[in-house]
UniProtKB/Swiss-Prot annotation:
Organism: Klebsiella pneumoniae (strain 342)
Family named by the database record: Belongs to the class-I aminoacyl-tRNA synthetase family. MetG type 1 subfamily.
Listed name of the protein: Methionine--tRNA ligase
Single Gene Ontology MF annotation: tRNA binding
Reactions it catalyzes: tRNA(Met) + L-methionine + ATP = L-methionyl-tRNA(Met) + AMP + diphosphate
EC number: 6.1.1.10
Motif 'KMSKS' region, residue range(s) on this chain: 333-337
Amino acid sequence: MTQVAKKILVTCALPYANGSIHLGHMLEHIQADVWVRYQRMRGHEVNFICADDAHGTPIMLKAQQLGITPEQMIGEMSQEHQTDFAGFDISYDNYHSTHSDENRELSELIYTRLKENGFIKNRTISQLYDPEKGMFLPDRFVKGTCPKCKSPDQYGDNCEVCGATYSPTELIDPKSVVSGATPVMRDSEHFFFDLPSFSEMLQAWTRSGALQEQVANKMQEWFESGLQQWDISRDAPYFGFEIPNAPGKYFYVWLDAPIGYMGSFKNLCDKRGDTTSFDEYWKKDSSAELYHFIGKDIVYFHSLFWPAMLEGSNFRKPTNLFVHGYVTVNGAKMSKSRGTFIKASTWLNHFDADSLRYYYTAKLSSRIDDIDLNLEDFVQRVNADIVNKVVNLASRNAGFISKRFDGVLAAELADPALYKTFTDAAESIGEAWDSREFGKAIREIMALADVANRYVDEQAPWVVAKQEGRDADLQAICTMGLNMFRVLMTWLKPVLPQLAARAEAFLNSELSWDAIQQPLLAHKVNPFKALYNRIEMKQVEALVEASKEEVKATAAPVTGPLADDPIQETITFDDFAKVDLRVALIENAEFVEGSDKLLRLTLDLGGEKRNVFSGIRSAYPDPQPLIGRLTVMVANLAPRKMRFGISEGMVMAAGPGGKDIFLLSPDDGAKPGQQVK
C-alpha cells in the first residue's frame, strides 16, 4: 500500500545537564528512535532532535561545587550525553543545548508575544529565602510535605507522588535543600503566565482524541481543580536567560526548556542552510506533524503550559504527546546500593546496545505503563529470541549456500505460499510499529520466526545435503530459509540497527520495507560470519558490580552511624509485614544474676505479660527509672531459651552499644498492646 510521505518532527525530553544518562533515560530515547527509524523506512521525512536542558539553580550550584563555570560544566556534560546516545545508536539529526543563541532569541520572542497579547501578569509575591545562603530558593531547592496529599520530602514545585503542582510557600514544614535552614519570607516582583486564559482551548485539544486516554483523563482532573497562573520568573542569582527589560529577573527553566525543541530545530535548519523549514514546521497552520516523547512525570508541563505558550505566541501546537512510564530493575526502583542504578556508559562496557533496545522494545506499548528490566529475564529473552530464533535461522542455511553453491541463492523459492504468509504480515507489523504497540510487533515477528525455524526443521537441509541428486532441493530450501531471515530482519531493523547492518553485509542487500515483496533469487550472498553472540549471567553480575564500584568511587565519604552500620539489603513489604511491633509497658526491670550485659524486663502488652532479656545494662546501670516507661517490642519473635530463662520477644533500641544505647519509646498517648505500623 503506497503511503503519502509526511513531514514529521520528533523530540525526546531534554536531559538535564547536571548528571549522566542512565537506563531510565534510555527507555524514552530507544522508544522514540525505534519509531523514527520505522517512519524513515516508510519514506517519511523525519527530523529527530534533542538538546540538553542546561539552565537552573541546580546547575549553577553544582558548578560552584566543582569549582568551574556553569558553561564549562554543561559543555562537558553535553559531550558525555551525546557520546552515550551515539553508543545506543539514537539517530538524532541534531543535539543542541538550551543555553544557545537560538534558544535565547526564541524565548525572548515568545515572551514578548505573550506580553504583547496580554498573557503576562506582574505581581509582588512573598517568596522563601535562605537566610544562611542569602538567596531566594527556587522550587527544587525547597523540600517539605505536599500540601495536597501530605507526602513528605517533596520538592517546592510539584509532588512526585500525586502529581500536583503548587508554589513553594504552600509546602508544609519547608526546608532549604542548600543549607537545611528553615526559610523566611521575603517579597519580590514576579512575572506570571496567564494559563487560565487558555482553559477552553486546552480542553478542546484534550477532547480531540489525539492524546493517550490516560493523559486526557489526568488533564481533565486538572481542569476540574482549576488552572492557576504560572510563575515564569526567578530571581538572581540564577543560571539562565535574563528577562528583557527586567534586570535581575530570569526565565524559569521550564519556560525556556521546551522552547529548546524549537531552538534545536532552528540550529539544524541553520546548519543546513535551510531558510524555510523552521517556519514550515512551526507556523500556526503547519501541516507537518510534531510529536514529543516524554515521561509521565512531566505531562503537566507538556500538556498544559507548553501548548498554551505556543497558542499565545502564534505558533503551532504538538500533534501529540507520546508518554511512557518509569523503568524499574528486578522489580524495584533503581538502586545505587544494589548496583541497579546503571549508567548508559556502564551498560555499553558489558553489553551491546541492541540487547537493551530489543528488551525495552519487546515490553513497550502505547500505554503509560512502567517497564521492568528483569536482568535474568533479559538474558533469557535475548538469547531465546535474537540468537536462537532469528540469527540461528541464518546460520542453519548460510553454510550450505556458501559451500555448495558458491554463495548463490536459488532462482526460485521452495515454498512461495509460505513466503507470502510472511510478506502479508507486513501491514499488521507496520501498524504495530506506527501505533507504538512495540510488544505486539515483536510477538508477531517472533511467532513468524518460529514458523520459519519449523520449516527448516521439517525440510532438514542437513539430511538433504547427504542425499545424491538433491542439490536443487537443498539450494531452494536454504534460499527459502535465508529469505525468511531477510524478512524478519527487515521488520527488526528499527530495533536492532547493529545486527541489521551485519545482516545487510551478509545478504549483500539493503533491508528495505518495500523490497521484501520481491525475494532474493539467483543472488550472491557473502560468506557467513557470526552475527550475534549469546549473552551470559556473568556479564550481568559484572555489570552490577561495576555499577556499585562507580557509586563508591563518586560518592562522598560516609560518616556517622551509616559508616559503621550500613543499611541492610532491601526487603519486600510482605517481609516487613511479618514483623509484629507492639507498644509495651515496662512493669519491672532488674539485673540478671550472672550477667553483666542483660536486664530482665517484665512487659505488659495490654492484657498479656512477657518476660524479655535485653542487652542494655551498660546504658542503664540503674534499671529502676525504666519502670513505668513505654517501649516498642517485637511481639511475634519466637521464644528463645537462654541460660537465665526464656526470652519472649525483643525490645527496640538504637545506638552503637556500650553507654550509647537508647531504648525506643512511643509518643504520649500510645497504649500497651497497640500495633506499631
